[in-house]
Every structure is written in structure tokens, then in C-alpha cells.
Amino acid sequence: MNFEEAEDINGIRFAWNALPSTKVEAGKVVVPTGVIYTPLKQREDLPVAVYDPIFCSNQNCKSILNPYCTIDPSGFWRCPLCSYRNPLPAHYQGVTPENLPLELQPGSSTIEYITARPVQNPPIFFLLIDLCQDEDNLAALKETLIVSLSLLPPNALIGLITYGTMVQVHDLGSEKISKSYIFRGDKEYTEKQISDMLNRPTSTPQGQLPQFANSLTRFFLPVEDVEFQLTSILENLGKDPWTVANGDRPLRSTGSALNVAANLLGSTFPGFGARIMLFSAGPGTLSPGLIVGPQLKEPIRSHSDIDKDNAKHFKKAVKFYDSIAAKMVKNAHTVDIFAGCYDQIGMLEMKNLCNLTGGTLLLSDAFTTSIFKQSFLRLFNKDHEGYLLMGFNGTFDVKTSKELKISGLIGHASSMNVKTQNVSENELGIGGTSQYRLCSVSPQHSYAVFFDVVNTQSLPQNAQSYTQFITHYQHASGTYRIRVTTVSNFLTSDEQTLTNSFDQEAAAVLMSRVTLFKSEQDDGADVLRWIDRMLIRLCQKFADYRKDQEESFRLGPQFQLYPQFIYYLRRSQFLQVFNNSPDETAFYRHVLLTEDTNNSLIMIQPTLTSFSLDSEPEAVLLDSVSIKDDKILLLDTFFHILIFHGKTIAQWRKAGYQNQPEYENFKLLLEEPKQEAAELLVDRYPLPRFIDTEEGGSQARFLYSKLNPSITYNSSEFATNNGAIVLTDDVSLQVFMGHLQKLVVSGSS
């Protein structure tokens, strides 16, 4: 069964491609019946219909006409999800198997409808710029923002807020002089207060009282009209003039700026696609939303502080930013957060602003780095027709046939609290609804959807369940579009059929998402114990072994890689937070919850490629035995691309052999991994950090931290020259598998 082919067509990867036929059987398979779905997955041959879809008339269903529907000669179609008989529209009469409309053709399991309903407003971009940063960093940010103006659609609306100790809302409609409104940075304003302050009277006949209209639209003007004015304002921005006392941090009003922006946008364009883009160079030091106090002697919170409840500002800040996130979701607006500093800015506290709205969370050391510049500009990538590859103001509906119910979703979405008949009482992730808000959606965004098998009766052979995913969104071209994917799965009670249908890669990614979801509520050690229990139970169910005989343990090819995926997940930065700041953890987890199966797997278990003079490049084990003196290694962790030169290669490079004509082959060897790394960098978002290092180099630690430590300073192979020695007390994959086998065959859980 080729799972990747199905993903290329429908953007879908099921953990179980055949589903257990009853609720009892589903409870025994351990890995949830779930799917990783990428609604806007790019596809060159995507069927596109320039008309509105036909919906099922059953008010409890409302699914869309699809290739699994049956058409009868009397002019009716039967819905595969609810079995309701619907009359075909008049212009569909005469449909035959040889003359099918586009949506009924077998290749239209995924189809996009361009509806007749026009979008009333173009996309809106609201820039929030932190002025509490050094001149070089600010200059680089301004330069990148000015470049980005040319990438926006000319009719896109744009607004600007700058902030330091005060919050400044810029009136871009004022041509002759630069005009702005100042708000206090230490005050939380209501939507009404902001609206009352910024609305201005419209001209009225003499003798009448002035009437207030919504003149707030003057803060959001078309890029083509204000590009010169906005460029001038950006070029003239300087560092926040407020003096910073010795031993203090700058007084930075991040919370107030976001509060003003969310309320102003909500008063002006509720329910229309809009993005607030925050560019922050440090933590908020003013309430509301204070992350750390102004005095440098107060350290910013660590993971340990949060775990021990010693982070005195943490809960209050989370509550404040979560309230803004709820407001953004209600208005269908998105927040993107870009950090450009070595310090933490409070991403952990602010993460739900992005997680609930589908926004970008980007961590970089400075706005001068290519990681920030290229990643930010890639956000404005366009399709072959020249439209932005971003959807706005979306909703995501999940429809199922009667055998399944929806347990929940894990990904960057929020519940719309629509509890239909196919919503399960057993929640996993964001549950209790069959409809989700996607304030922003792109070809990258992937969602884990989990199902509950509710059927209790045995079913006939070849029984099928049906699932339909419906994504409504505002396209950058100014149209409303509907992407529809309909799939069917066999329901089976045959264990061998289930085994053959298991996609271990999709299963590992689904379990990683469940693990991250649990990590938000439970203690880290409890989460690790839970993963281990699930792995033991899966192996007890599907491995071949004789009780109490470890050497008899065998896993079939469908399950063989799964334990090592879990091993690397346990060791990953997603769960082992010891060496990361809370902001880094929030960033890494955010990206894992965005990406599809293949990219998520690279994050969980990075890829390692070996290059040598006497052989072609080859994929090698992510293991310390793969480090050889005469080889170059290319490591891809998704967040880092690292080229590691073995000891001998590094010595030859230092000696300059590559510059001598007789060693042309050595020069080509040095170039080969660089070319492959460049190919990996082309489409990756966010842009990974590129590292070029060698044996003994300080940055070689990035490679060593990812390798399975099969040879450590205290292992019996310590004295051999069979690979590199890893200075760690971590358990190796071999020891992990040994423990797993022992527990499985003993019947322990």
C-alpha cells in the first residue's frame, strides 16, 4: 500500500488505512484511528470547479456531492455519508457514467470550488514594530519590511503601530505631515475606548450634533496608495527615545500594543481576513502582558521556575494574551510573532495568539539574520497565478458516516463549538465540535483529526466508512473557495488486514501530536511514561513473541521502524526541555504542530547522509558509528542543516588540497553536501540554520546531540575505532529496544 501516493492526491495520511470494525476492536489497537490532513496541499492537477457545490439536503449531514455518491436513473443521488436521497439539480439531469460532472469523476476525491460570492475586503496586514532595539537591528528590520511591501497585493490594506514605552498608532492617510495617536503602554484599553478615541466626527449640516461614523478605516489603507508614505515613515523610525536606567531593561509595552491592535482591527474589519504581524526584540516589561520586571536583577522565567510555580508573572501574562487570542479567533484574525533577539520575548506566554489563529511563530537571534529575512519574505510566496499562498478567515468541517464520530483535532485551529450528531463524547485534542475556525491556512498547515469507531455490531465483509473534509476560506484573489476531500476506508475485524494497513510514519506523527497535547497539561515524566506504555501495548498486540523469551521477539515490516521513531521522539527537544528556554520549546512545538508527515518525521528523527571519495552519497544510521574520519556527513533536523567533516577530511581541507588541480575530486566532494544542503534550503519554512563544522569543532555538538549514542565513554566499545564516542549518559537505541522486548515478552505494561 503506497501511503505517499494517497497523500499526494488528497493530502491525507491515516495511521490505519483500514479501520477496526467495532468500538471494542478499536480500543485494542492502541494507536488512535486518526489522520494527518493538509487541506490546501498543492497539486498541479487539482480539479477546480468555477461554481458553487451541491450539498446534501439532510440538515444533519450537509455533505457535498462527491465521487462516492451513487446516481440513479430517476434523477436522484444518494449521499454515502448519511444514505439520504437527494434530487439532482435540473442542469444535472441526464448524468450518465460516461458523462459525469467534474465533482463526480473518480479523480475528484479532492476538488476546489471557486464560489460566486465575492470577498468584500482585500486581505489586511497590521504591522507592530518594537522600537526598543539597537539601531542596527532596527535598520535591518525596516529594510526587510520595505522590501515586503512590494510582495503584497497592491489592493491589500496595511496599518502600522510602533511601540516602546508608549504605543503609537500611525494615521497613514495624512499625506503632508506624519500623524499618529499615542496610547499609554501600561494600560489595557477596551474596544469601545479605542473606538471612541480614534473615531472622528463626520461633517454634518450646521445646527446638528456631530454623528460618529466608523472612520477607523483610515488606519488601514491600500498598499498602492500609501507605499511612498509608509516607506517614508519606516525609514524615519528611530530607537525608542525613552531613557533606560542603568541596570534596567527598556520599558517595552508589547501587551498594550497587541491589545490596541486587536481592538482596533476588531472594530474595523470583524470577520475579514487580517494578520497582525508583531516584530519584537525583547520581553514585555510593562503590564498588561508583562513577562519580566524592568530591573535586570530579576531573571526571566525558566522551565524550572514554571514547573515549580516560581514564575510570578507567568499565569497573569498567559491569561492576558489568551484573552486577546480569543478576540482574534472571534473576528477571524491571525497573529504572527517574529522574535529578533538573543533574549526571550515571552513566546511561551503568547503562543496561543499564533496556535489558535494559525499564525507564524519565528525565533531568530536578530532581525539582521538571513533566518529572519528570508523566512519572513517566504511568507509572501505566490502561486503560479501570482496570488499569495495564504488563505484567510477559514472554517474546517469534518463529516463522517455513521460508523465514525469525531474525537477532536490537534493543530493550529480553534473550536467553533458546533456539536453535530457525529461528535464523540471521548475527546482527544480540541473536541466537542465538528467545525473549526482556521483564521489562517496555507499549503503547509496540517491538522491531526482523530476518530472514534462507534459501531458495535459486526459488519459485512468489505464494509466501508466515509469521511469528508470541507475547508471554506478566503483566497488571496478576492474569492471565497471551498476545498473538499472525500475518502473511504474499509472496516475490518481481520488483524492481518489491519496490520497491512498500518502507516507507521503517520502513526508516529499522530502520537507525537497527542504527546505534545498531553505535555501542555501533564508533568513531563508522566508524559514519557505514557508514551512508553503505549509502545509496550502496541508491541504486545502486534509483535510475534513467546512469553518470557526475549530472543523470540519479532516486529513485522509495518511496525519495524515505529519503536525507533518513539525513541527519538523521547530524546527530542519537543519533550526534553533541559537545554532549551521556554520560548525555544514553544517555537519548536509550534512548528511540529504545523507540518505534514514527512517534515514532522525529519524533526522527530533527523536524516543523516554520508559523502565519501569512493562511493555515492548514501543515507546512514543516525548513530555515532556513522562518524568516520574519511567521510562528510549532512544532518537535516528541519531546524538545522549541518555539514560535518570527519577528522581526515578536515585536515585535508585545512591543508588546501581542494585548491590544487590534481585533487579536483576532493574539491567536488567538499561541494557535494553544500549543493544538497542548498536544495533543502530552497522551500523550507522557517529557513533552517546552516552550520559548517568538523571533528572537534564547537558546533559539532549539534550533530552529537542527535545521534544514537551506541558508543559512549562508558561502553565496552570505548577503545575501538568503530565510530565516534558520545559523552552522554543517555540510553542508546539498542538498550531501549532491549528493555522494550523484555517488558513486552514478560506481559508487563
Swiss-Prot record:
Pfam families: Gelsolin, Sec23_BS, Sec23_helical, Sec23_trunk, zf-Sec23_Sec24. Zn(2+) binds at residues 56, 61, 79, 82. It is a peripheral membrane protein. Keywords: Cytoplasm, Cytoplasmic vesicle, Endoplasmic reticulum, ER-Golgi transport, Golgi apparatus, Membrane, Metal-binding, Protein transport, Transport, Zinc. One of its GO terms (biological process) is positive regulation of ER to Golgi vesicle-mediated transport. It comes from the Eukaryota. Its main location: cytoplasm. One of its GO terms (cellular component) is endoplasmic reticulum membrane. Transmembrane segments: none annotated. The keyword Transport applies. One of its GO terms (molecular function) is zinc ion binding. It is found in: Cytoplasm; Cytoplasmic vesicle, COPII-coated vesicle membrane; Endoplasmic reticulum membrane; Golgi apparatus membrane. InterPro entries: ADF-H/Gelsolin-like_dom_sf, Gelsolin-like_dom, Gelsolin-like_dom_sf, Sec23, Sec23/24_helical_dom, Sec23/24_helical_dom_sf, Sec23/24_trunk_dom, Sec23_24_beta_S. Belongs to the SEC23/SEC24 family. SEC23 subfamily. Component of the coat protein complex II (COPII) which promotes the formation of transport vesicles from the endoplasmic reticulum (ER). The coat has two main functions, the physical deformation of the endoplasmic reticulum membrane into vesicles and the selection of cargo molecules. The COPII coat is composed of at least 5 proteins: the SEC23/24 complex, the SEC13/31 complex, and the protein SAR1. This is Protein transport protein SEC23.
